[in-house]
Amino acid sequence: MENAHTKTVEEVLGHFGVNESTGLSLEQVKKLKERWGSNELPAEEGKTLLELVIEQFEDLLVRILLLAACISFVLAWFEEGEETITAFVEPFVILLILVANAIVGVWQERNAENAIEALKEYEPEMGKVYRQDRKSVQRIKAKDIVPGDIVEIAVGDKVPADIRLTSIKSTTLRVDQSILTGESVSVIKHTDPVPDPRAVNQDKKNMLFSGTNIAAGKAMGVVVATGVNTEIGKIRDEMVATEQERTPLQQKLDEFGEQLSKVISLICIAVWIINIGHFNDPVHGGSWIRGAIYYFKIAVALAVAAIPEGLPAVITTCLALGTRRMAKKNAIVRSLPSVETLGCTSVICSDKTGTLTTNQMSVCRMFILDKVEGDTCSLNEFSITGSTYAPIGEVQKDDKPVKCHQYDGLVELATICALCNDSALDYNEAKGVYEKVGEATETALTCLVEKMNVFDTELKGLSKIERANACNSVIKQLMKKEFTLEFSRDRKSMSVYCTPNKPSRTSMSKMFVKGAPEGVIDRCTHIRVGSTKVPMTPGVKQKIMSVIREWGSGSDTLRCLALATHDNPLKREEMHLEDSANFIKYETNLTFVGCVGMLDPPRIEVASSVKLCRQAGIRVIMITGDNKGTAVAICRRIGIFGQDEDVTSKAFTGREFDELSPSAQRDACLNARCFARVEPSHKSKIVEFLQSFDEITAMTGDGVNDAPALKKSEIGIAMGSGTAVAKTASEMVLADDNFSTIVAAVEEGRAIYNNMKQFIRYLISSNVGEVVCIFLTAALGFPEALIPVQLLWVNLVTDGLPATALGFNPPDLDIMNKPPRNPKEPLISGWLFFRYLAIGCYVGAATVGAAAWWFIAADGGPRVSFYQLSHFLQCKEDNPDFDGVDCAIFESPYPMTMALSVLVTIEMCNALNSLSENQSLLRMPPWENIWLVGSICLSMSLHFLILYVEPLPLIFQITPLNLTQWLMVLKISLPVILMDETLKFVARNYLEQPGKECVQPATKSSCSLSACTDGISWPFVLLIMPLVVWVYSTDTNFSDMFWS
């Protein structure tokens, strides 16, 4: 039934043709069940395991690798001779990588869909209904409830469907609907129509929503919506419809994959076409097909070389290390890619209660009457320190501490707060914090009494558990609570009837009252001044109400409670307590004692975090279910708004936002910093608008109502104290529910991205080198310098370890002084592309050069000519060009070993270059990242392992090297450091803002030797120089290769 909240009880009952006392007939139930179905959320049909596995192979890079593995497998099948076994290693390793990636992908997908299933926990199992087949109430399965059913609910029940209340059988009905609306306190319900058809859920006071809990009272109502038509069902539909966005990093890697696949395809085809003339060479037995297959194998090797197989594993490892660091800061990351996304967050949409605030209601101001003369009066105003439930703080007047027992009015005020109260403080030993037992408002009053200590109770030596209620206990020993007149909506107050524990002539029964100021003060005839009682005059009343209005609408927007007493109440037997309508009669002729103002105070550290966000170019938006006045007041206190800033067009309620045109709503999301009284649909809409501006949005939430927006935003952040639905729909969980933790996580995300850029570029330059190597050997007609199994080893193991260690690079000191990076910013800019292409070309040329050196110039090598090397495929006994050359020498493992050793060593030097994007190694020596030094040592150890430990040399088709050969490897490898240092110098001094270095030779003073050598690590210089001198002073016939 649409808009049931706007209809009268009679209209709703008439719509379903049902009587409240008898309920539906079985015939009606049957028809309604056929029409509306079961009252349950349908199980989401997830993807089958096979569909999930196939999905993992939709990535272009993965498909290319899979194709390369299949082709390698087919070619290995037809391989002959000694290479038969080793030929199968390559396809096997590639398939192993793909299977591992698929397992991780499937596991992540399965986790993502758990959020929808978690909604099931809010479905009640049973419900109590009236139906015509029985005279009394009956318990049935909640899934069998249909629209039109008359349902009975009582304290402790979970509401089984969306219900329009028809009658309340207790004084009040309180409902905890925080999981759905985000309201921090339970809500009082009534049965009157709410005429506004566009009312938000918070304002539908005559409705009960499926999945919410009854906190107090008993009532009956008629079911108006079941299953997917309930409010919680609508949330489920939103979550099903929400497609998970790919993170900026995933998008960048997708783009990189597409570009790389095109480049790979072109190079592979080019290599194959270049060598068409060699298809008929004698080495292939004169068979054109065998020649074509041989060069096809080289093209496959090229594809394997070009794909950074280790990249997924390194990224996963780096992100996992980041999550560990974040966990230490109370940010528990559920989705690994979101770690990097945090780094480009440009908007944080934060809930108010418990995130920006403590969610611990606290009394911060109070007043009592000081003097009254006719229509004029003066007040004693006090402020109270402490913003949590901890009974620690002091009462101050004019910023100076006061002793509360010196003011008679404060003693009576504390007595009312302690006795007109059903809540208490409790010390949780496991968490080490004080917690509320009962309502937040009443717990704030309990805490106030502890801070006031009006009877000077000795508190030293008490345990924290004893301290929790020490002062309240003293007051409760003086007076005994006989009965309570519960809160009701019409009078907006509650009271307790108390008698003294030790009766005497002077002490007598009293009624203590607390409630909304306007309701209580209207029923006050007198005011308490010290220990005397003075008549309330219109002027005094106006003064009191003006102060209360100022507190309620000023910068604090306090929630005010008036406290009063009835000095001569009726005796219990003279009261008729069965009917709550009589309560107001007994709460008249009251004496006003004082007023307290409370709020959910901001967390102490939030203001500095909001300031840090502003420095980092991140906009903070508060989105709350609370009212607008309170929300704006908190925004001012924490710095989202300035103290006197005009909030017109910067703060909206959900209703005001709905009334805007779509274009105005879009503009509102661009400028606003506060949204109050919002519903789940508003949060999702705000996220959509922000995403349309290319903003990267982090959204916080804790209730079921927040789940769709959490899932839709780039970073969903759930509270540690939130619901399972919110947690499973989110990417990150805040263990301490603290906004400052989000800011710390953003800082960590930025550092992780910077490090990730370094190792991605490091791996890419390595792959460029491998591609250049294979391309050069094919273009020059040289024998194979590297084979696929060696390339896999380098890409996965020897490169993988330093790349992972680069994730430990220290973050920049000014990382939070820069604006968020543009998520569309490429991983590799034009300059960086040139830089890594240049390095890659050197890596490729050096690798081929190392193999050529062995053939042409090495002692113990064949010393063939360049022509013979580049035409080795024409080598046979009757060819005069190869006279005296043993053709078997072109299949020697030595040149391949030289090429592999140079590739590995050069990559270790490249890892050192990647310590910083533009900072020189002379100023940032290797031990700045000790993990990198360790990983380089381990990678070189693994390289020695495959060189010197049998049977590994056979598998990798390599052989041990002697000292001269190793010196040659170092000679060829070390120049890559000098080359990158030159490129860094250019970037530092001509492409970025000039730093401290000597870059402006206009004045000689700025180019002094001391200025240019400032910050150089001399220990590193003294360590490296002797090594370089020794390497390059040793003769290895290097020059002979060029003379040849």
Swiss-Prot record:
Cytoplasmic topological domain residue ranges: 1-48, 111-253, 314-756, 808-827, 917-929, 985-1044
E.C. number: 7.2.2.10
Residues recorded as bearing 3'-nitrotyrosine in the entry: Y294, Y295
Transmembrane segments: 49-69, 90-110, 254-273, 296-313, 757-776, 787-807, 828-850, 897-916, 930-948, 964-984
Positions that bind Mg(2+): D351, T353, D702
Subcellular compartments: Endoplasmic reticulum membrane; Sarcoplasmic reticulum membrane
Entry domain remark: Ca(2+) and ATP binding cause major rearrangements of the cytoplasmic and transmembrane domains. According to the E1-E2 model, Ca(2+) binding to the cytosolic domain of the pump in the high-affinity E1 conformation is followed by the ATP-dependent phosphorylation of the active site Asp, giving rise to E1P. A conformational change of the phosphoenzyme gives rise to the low-affinity E2P state that exposes the Ca(2+) ions to the lumenal side and promotes Ca(2+) release. Dephosphorylation of the active site Asp mediates the subsequent return to the E1 conformation.
UniProt name for this protein: Sarcoplasmic/endoplasmic reticulum calcium ATPase 2
Organism lineage string: Eukaryota, Metazoa, Chordata, Craniata, Vertebrata
